[in-house]
């Protein structure tokens, strides 16, 4: 599954908000330097979707606030 993400680096609080069927807003406290914000976005998405971090791949938008991620696999079963 592909999802579009609007990144909000240097936010006061961290969250994942669903804005559309495949469109999310992700706020992180990390600055957009040396991939730190992207790494934190992957962590938050893994928690949100209940999957491992290695199942989330950044496809496009490495240096942009508009990003495209590929989510691989299904949710982990509790």
What does each of the following model-derived ranges do?
Residues 11, 25-49:
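Compact, glycine-rich, soluble single-domain proteins
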Residues 15-17, 37, 60:
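Short histidine-centered beta-strand/loop micro-motifs
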Residues 42-43, 47-78:
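C-terminal structural segments of small proteins and small subunits
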Residues 1-27:
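N-terminal first-folded block
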Residues 8, 29, 59-61:
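Short loop/turn motifs enriched for small/polar and acidic residues
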């Amino acid at each position: 599954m592909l999802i579009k993400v609007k990144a909000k680096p240097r936010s006061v609080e961290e969250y994942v908000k669903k804005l559309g069927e495949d469109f999310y807003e992700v706020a992180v406290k990390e600055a957009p330097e040396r991939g730190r914000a992207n790494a934190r976005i992957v962590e938050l998405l893994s928690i949100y979707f209940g999957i491992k971090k290695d199942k989330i791949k950044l496809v496009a938008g490495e240096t942009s606030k508009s990003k495209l991620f590929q989510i691989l696999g299904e949710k982990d079963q509790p």
